[in-house]
């Protein structure tokens, strides 16, 4: 299965290490098209924004499922979620409920599968369940 992993890049990299761990976990069984999101040394310096947009939207269309970590607010992740919804891609949103409140634009949209958590250890069994469910679909 091809997974589009979404996490904050320009909105803040405070959770980059978490993204990296989530991506590596998913990669044990599936393909993560956006593995660069978990790169702790990620830099978009020198990249042409239209190239980034075209690559990311191509990956979104190619993906089977979108998994987003939304604890750190990001305009880009919000756009990616809306884009995935447009193409009816299953979307799963994770966020640490002790650190943030999810935007009503996401939490109030019944298309999205919302997964609040308190501890990182809660994430991985949910990912297993998501990937198994989407694989069976």
Question: What do these predicted ranges mean?
Answer:
Residues 1-137:
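Conserved catalytic or regulatory cores that recognize and/or transform ribose-phosphate-containing ligands
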């Amino acid at each position: 299965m091809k997974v589009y992993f979404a996490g904050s890049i320009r909105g803040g990299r405070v959770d980059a290490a978490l993204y990296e761990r989530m991506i590596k976990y998913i990669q044990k069984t599936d393909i993560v098209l956006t593995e660069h999101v978990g790169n702790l040394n990620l830099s978009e310096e020198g990249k042409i924004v239209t190239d980034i947009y075209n690559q990311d939207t191509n990956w979104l269309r190619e993906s089977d499922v979108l998994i987003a970590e939304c604890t750190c607010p990001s305009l880009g992740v919000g756009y990616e979620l809306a884009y995935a919804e447009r193409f009816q891609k299953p979307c799963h949103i994770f966020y640490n409920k002790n650190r943030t409140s999810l935007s009503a634009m996401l939490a109030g949209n019944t298309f999205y599968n919302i997964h609040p958590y308190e501890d990182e250890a809660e994430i991985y069994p949910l990912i297993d369940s998501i990937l198994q469910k989407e694989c069976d679909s």
